[in-house]
């Protein structure tokens, strides 16, 4: 996204049309002039660097020790230390608040509610996560999400799928605002499911909303054009951070560097082994929202040390050296990765991540155009089998299988449709590729056939979905291909979980009263911003 005002860019482009033949920049490989209608109109647009999106902080990447920096007191052995490198990226300054999520719910209900209320229902957090069998938490069930007293508190009860849907919505709303701000798009506050703005649909030429004006083109055959990815105007997608990104950002080791040396490693997002502020002005104050000990969630009346019985406002306590709040306590946070115990050992040492399912846009079989869902929301039945032993003698007397079904929202009207890459589609060229041969690599090295005891069974083993052989849900493990990692401590956790290297996991359809999320965004181009060396 260019930092130049787009109106200035439009004026420069219009002037270039008149002065194209006078001193235009030329290609270093062909010698032809850029931005010249007489040469076909190939454009080189003015560009400085990526604009920082709303709510984001630039996290300058680098190398660090990914995994355990504290004793493995739970003996999970699931975070073996390993040196990796994380590219620069952006991350939300705070956790997503109740008020921000209510903005999303309001928009979803306004756009889809009249025709497709199920889309709105799917976005609703589970407020019943507050209930406990032997505690009176009904006030949180009734008031926490919607009462203005909690508007600046982190949203909870959101599952992994809902967090991803929020990221997709946020991407479209931010890019829509950019086009309106620059005078290219009509502001239509009454958009419906047929004409709301979608970044992917717009770039695919399938969006049917109201444009205010187009960009001038140097192509004599088409004097005006839509915004393209090559213009650098649109921001990259908001998304969940990867586990490595989250952990890297949480430590904030940029504050402990002298030259290229990291002087001190950290157990928490701050220096030292304690959880109290050593600064003379704030000495003794708790640095994060967590449980200090048995039954002590907030301190003593008259001196509430952490000033929070459950969650705390997203802008509270002290930020780490990247300027990020609550990277230790308050609520744990979803990350993008699928859980496996040995991911830190198996994943690549550059931008490690487990969870790849490679996809491509669906296209019309006749003309190859990108397909957009212009019909109704598409729900996909989500199934896995739970095996329960039969009998009480402890012997192997068979199993009873229950089919557990749930539906996930995979497509809504107005969005580009996607599919997994497949050998069945010659255009995917999987038989010619060297870096991947299929779509699903969630179980690579840990859960696929090659890493299982069924490897010697040959072709029969491949009839089972990846991850279902080694990890048989509820029979031998709670780990499967839809168990995702969440990081950090929370208002319900002891100090051990505030170490960024610790990790836990949960089914992507489940949620907790102490689990929230924050968004991230890819940094394109230089890993440092303007003004940095």
Regions found by a protein language model. Give the residues of each.
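Bacterial N-terminal signal peptides that target proteins for export
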Residues: 2-10
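Short, P/G- and charge-enriched loop/turn segments at secondary-structure junctions
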Residues: 44-46, 76-79, 473, 503-508
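Short, structured beta-strand segments at or near domain termini in extracellular proteins/domains
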Residues: 512-531
């Amino acid at each position: 996204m260019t930092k130049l005002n787009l109106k200035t860019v439009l004026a420069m482009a219009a002037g270039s049309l008149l002065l194209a033949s006078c001193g235009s920049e030329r290609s270093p490989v062909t010698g032809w002039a850029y931005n010249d209608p007489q040469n076909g109109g190939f454009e080189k647009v003015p560009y400085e660097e990526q604009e920082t999106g709303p709510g984001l902080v630039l996290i300058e990447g680098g190398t660090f020790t990914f995994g355990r920096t504290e004793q493995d007191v739970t003996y999970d052995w699931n975070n073996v230390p390993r040196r990796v490198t994380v590219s620069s990226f952006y991350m939300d300054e705070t956790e997503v608040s109740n008020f921000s999520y209510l903005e999303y719910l309001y928009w979803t209900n306004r756009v889809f509610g009249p025709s497709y209320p199920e889309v709105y229902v799917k976005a609703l957090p589970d407020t019943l996560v507050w209930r406990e069998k032997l505690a009176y938490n009904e006030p949180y069930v009734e008031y926490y999400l919607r009462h203005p007293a909690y508007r600046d508190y982190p949203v909870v009860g959101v599952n992994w799928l809902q967090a991803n849907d929020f990221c997709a919505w946020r991407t479209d709303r931010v890019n829509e605002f950019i086009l309106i701000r620059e005078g290219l798009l009509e502001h239509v506050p009454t958009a419906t499911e047929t004409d709301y703005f979608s970044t992917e649909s717009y770039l695919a030429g399938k969006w049917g909303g109201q444009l205010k004006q187009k960009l001038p083109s140097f192509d004599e055959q088409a004097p005006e054009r839509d915004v393209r990815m090559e213009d650098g105007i649109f921001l990259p997608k908001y998304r969940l951070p990867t586990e490595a990104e989250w952990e890297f950002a949480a430590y904030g080791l940029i504050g402990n560097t002298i030259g290229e040396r990291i002087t001190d490693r950290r157990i928490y997002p701050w220096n030292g082994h304690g959880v109290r502020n050593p600064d003379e002005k704030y000495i003794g104050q708790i640095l994060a929202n967590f449980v200090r000990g048995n039954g002590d969630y907030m301190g003593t009346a008259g001196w509430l040390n952490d000033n929070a019985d459950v969650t705390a406002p997203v802008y509270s306590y002290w930020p780490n050296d990247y300027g990020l709040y609550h990277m230790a306590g308050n609520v744990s946070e979803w990350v993008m990765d699928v859980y496996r115990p040995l991911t830190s050992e198996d994943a690549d040492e550059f931008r490690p991540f487990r969870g790849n399912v490679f996809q491509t846009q669906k296209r019309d079989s006749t003309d190859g155009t990108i397909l957009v869902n212009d019909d109704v929301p598409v729900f996909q039945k989500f199934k896995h089998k739970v095996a329960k032993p039969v009998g009480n003698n402890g012997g192997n007397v068979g199993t009873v299988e229950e089919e557990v079904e749930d539906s996930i929202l995979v497509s809504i009207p107005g969005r580009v449709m996607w599919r997994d890459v497949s050998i069945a589609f010659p255009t995917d060229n999987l038989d010619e590729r060297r870096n991947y041969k299929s779509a699903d690599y969630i179980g690579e090295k840990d859960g696929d056939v090659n890493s299982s005891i069924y490897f010697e069974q040959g072709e029969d083993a491949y009839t089972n979905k990846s991850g279902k052989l080694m990890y048989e849900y509820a029979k031998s493990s709670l780990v499967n291909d839809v168990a995702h990692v969440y990081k950090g401590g929370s208002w319900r956790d002891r100090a051990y979980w505030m170490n960024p290297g610790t990790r836990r996991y949960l089914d992507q359809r489940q949620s907790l009263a102490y689990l929230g999320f924050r968004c991230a965004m890819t940094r394109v181009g230089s890993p440092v911003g303007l003004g940095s060396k």
